[in-house]
Amino acid sequence: IWESSYVSILTKRLTNRGFLTGPMLPIYGSGAVVMLCATYPVQSSDVGIFLLGLIAATILEYVTGVVMETLFQVRYWDYSDKKFNIQGHICLSSSLAWGVFTLLLIRVVHPRISALLEKIPQNVCFSALVVITIVFAIDFASSFHAAMDLRQILESITNLKSDAEKLRERFIVLTDSVSETLRDKIGTIKKPESSRIEEFQTSVSECLEKLYSLVPKEKTADVIRLKERFAYLGELKNAISKRMDFRKIILLKGNPMLTSKKYADALNSLKEQIGLNKNK
């Protein structure tokens, strides 16, 4: 809840923060368990609780960040702009916060929750545990599938841009077969940008029509093939757009600070499509 509130304030929009569609954040649940286990031998020392909680939670955050980036090719958090960070996955300020949270968990939160649970009948607790576990498992499986599909979409958009650039280069070669005085009538095709694919397609269509009427007859077949390949890329683009369903949109909106080293341009394109980059 606190992170969703924090991000909502930063982005000035209501944000359901996290990897899952529901309100649960696995890293915090896992972090709490790790904190409890790691600090068990030093329960009498606040300094020991702070230090061991800091170290254990930082290790968990680093490992989780590396694994998620490897799987999904995106970062759900990035501390690269923070001082004393390691590969952007962890940083000093975050680690210090983990230490403070560990103290709060051990000294304030956990004792009260334990006392509350002791007052609730065991069969009620067990039933609640079963229901929550089932809901969590379904949400996790669905969210994992959406995240993997998002990675494939980002890869497809990147490949689409690369293919479009190759066809653009072929267009330039065909344009060279036209006399210099006629080239101005054809126009030029700008480099394809993932965030401006529609404009690129319009530019291509107009230029190819002009090129077809001006190239030597022996080159018209090449222009026709080029038009067909551009049309195919358009179909691929539409197919990619249809894969952006509700769950993937929720995933992006719930993580507006999502970054990707490998697919940065493609990710920015998707963010623009759903209105996340309007203020940039």
Language-model segment annotations:
Residues 1-280:
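Aromatic-rich, lipid-facing transmembrane alpha helices and their immediate juxtamembrane interface loops
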